Structure formats: structure tokens, C-alpha cells
């Protein structure tokens, strides 16, 4: 794919990969933690901690350089992969997501399947 620098890469368990592949799951969630902030915003973990403070207070809609998300089915050799356009990314409480946590989470809404 031409725009790999604009791609967020995520590894999923077989169950969640298959849910997305079937179209039953159109949102992927990641807890707002330094690790995920640094991956989503392509920044250092030190900067990520400062960014988290602002995210929780100032933002709902998330703007990043990521245009696509690539899902990999588990950690295995020659793992199946899918690429989707990111329709929208926002921050919400994770209580009513499939994470079921009362914390801030990134809500990655999937758009068109590219491959």
C-alpha cells in the first residue's frame, strides 16, 4: 500500500479479527494509555503522558496522521491481515464498549475495507 506511513497497525485475537472481518464489529477500542497514545500519535511515551492529560479534558474527536488501520490475526507466521480506512477516531468512556472498563478509550470507527 502506498500510504504505509499513515497506517496504524494492530494485532487482534482470532475472535475479534473474525468479528471485524464478518462486519459485525465496526469499532475497535484501545485504552488511553501512554503506549497507545504514542502509537496513535507517533510520539514518545514521555510526550504521550502529557498528551493524555489534554486528551481527557479537551478532546472528543481525535485528529492524527493515520488514515488507515491494518489488523493482523494474532502473532503467527504469515498471519492474515486486513486494511480499513479510518472513518473517525474519538475518545469516549469504555464502560459500554467491548472493553467494559470505566476509563477513557480510543474509539476507532472503521470505514471502507481496502483489502
Model-derived regions: residue spans:
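Structured alpha/beta reader/binder surfaces that contact nucleic acids or chromatin modification marks
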Residues: 2-7, 11-115
